[in-house]
Amino acid sequence: ASWQDGIKEYRTKKGLKHVYDEYVNVGVFYVSDDFIKTSGSATGHMKLLKSIKSDGSVKEGETISVTYSCNYIPKKDNIYQTSNITPMIRQNECYLLVYDKIVNSDISEKFETHGAKLPINYSTGNSASWDISPLRLSDSQTLKIIEKGKVYTIEELSDYDLFTCGTGILQEWYRTKDAILRYYVGDNYAELAANWKRKERTGNE
């Protein structure tokens, strides 16, 4: 059996719908500014757009200073050992994140997550539609857009995804990301991100 089969078996035994279920806090965050990458971490600001599960430590609409552990590998359970995808945090993008209880202190907040980018578009319009369409998926180096209708291999897609990981983990992530977002956010998760981006641009509710 593959390690993917092992994950599914573990989820079934534990009654887990998704890897996020053991966390207290789950939310959709909007990235307010560019994150500054340092060795093993990145710092910046995020606004909580939608609270999905929460202990109340961060309120919807609140912007917090964040230190993101870029090399973080969750330790809570074996299931998390295969979920070490690391998002490259980018300004004006939205992410589904799980995080530990926020403690009031002078240091930035720590997020425990492998993350799921919100949303992902494999078929996009031309550059003129970037400002009104959901957040685009593009090559992290050249910002070249994925071509509509073209079939890509996992290796080719990894060049266009803003994540770093092995292709096996990437393949598993592609299979589960939509289910995760729909489970916690709803079927309109892509619309949610597009509307939020429009509000930030125009200042209108």
Map each language-model feature to its residues.
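OB/S1-fold single-stranded nucleic-acid-binding modules
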Residues: 1-23, 183-203
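Short structured motifs
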Residues: 12-15, 31, 83
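Solvent-exposed loop/turn segments at secondary-structure junctions
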Residues: 34-37, 51-54, 70-74, 102-105
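Beta-strand/loop nucleic-acid-binding surfaces
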Residues: 59-86
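Structural detector for short beta-strands of small beta-barrel domains
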Residues: 22-52
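Netrin-like (NTR/C345C) domain of secreted extracellular proteins
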Residues: 78-205
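Extracellular/periplasmic catalytic domains that process cell-envelope and extracellular macromolecules
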Residues: 21, 38, 57-59, 87-91
